[in-house]
Amino acid sequence: MKIIVFGNGLVGSQLAAHLVAAGHDATALGRDHGIDTTTGQGLAATLVGAEVAVDLTNSPSWADDDVLAFFTSSTEHLLAAEREAGVRHHVILSIVGADRLPASGYLRAKVAQERAVEAGGVPYSIVRSAQFFEFVPGIADAGTVEGVVHATSAHLQPIASRDVVAHLAEVVTGPPLDGVVEVAGPEPLGVDTLVRRLFAITGDPREVRTDRHAGYLGAELEDTSLGPAPGSGAWLAPTTYDRWLAEAPR
């Protein structure tokens, strides 16, 4: 099966390698390959003969208007090129709870992306993932003010990127869902707890201060904001945060 993965970062590179190991013709591409999803540059040639396209692209800017423009234009150009090429399955990676936190401009843009995919005329699957363990250091840095990390105690249900890749590969190689599937880690944990456990392993000396008003993706969280929806039948990954911390390279 020929599969084109748009986005060659943390998930895209792993996904392509996983698919190749399983015997598929899979390639992860980014701007360094002459691809620009916001303009359509390079898409037609890239999609020749492809059966599946996976959109893992992300906006280079976090400004609300820029993020919305990125996901809107990228999705429009990708779907148009896929329709022309006869692609039979369009897969995107979205975020668990994106539709429950409208105060976040980034998440509003992800919802707009989902809606465009649903109306795009290509059979599709939307995989909503919880936050990745790998992004906890970035969350800590974003919440640091004068050497103190401000982190909410509201829960996420984060997941190892390798587990996301394993389940994403099953979706990519299966029939289109024409719907949404959610994936998350095995346990809900407060953002402050995630950072403290990370620092206990890495020896980071920064104080972690619990702050219920600390922002996350531009909004305040409640415990139910970014966890799997009740009754969603979310797939729960096997890797715990503590196991991931123990195994992560230093």
List each language-model region with its residue ranges.
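Actinobacteria-biased recognition of intrinsically disordered, low-complexity terminal regions
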Residues: M1-I4, A17-H24, G30, Q41, ...
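Oxidoreductase cofactor-interface core, primarily capturing Rossmann-like NAD(P)-dependent enzymes
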Residues: I3-F6, L10-D25, A85-R88, D99-E207, ...
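NAD(P)H-binding glycine-rich loop region in Rossmannoid oxidoreductase-like domains
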Residues: A17, A21-A85, V96-P102
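A short acidic, often aromatic-flanked loop/helix-cap motif at beta-alpha or helix-coil junctions
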Residues: G34-I35, G42-A44, F133-E134, L189, ...
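Pocket-edge positions in alpha/beta enzyme catalytic cores
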Residues: I35-T38, A63-V67, L156, P186, ...
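Short, amphipathic alpha-helical "lid/cap" segments that border enzyme active or binding sites
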Residues: A44-L47, L79, S161-A169, P238-A246
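Active-site beta-alpha turn of Rossmann-fold NAD(P)-dependent dehydrogenases/reductases
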Residues: T57, V91-S94, R128-A130
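Mobile cap/lid helix-loop segments that border enzyme active or cofactor-binding sites
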Residues: P188, V195-R250
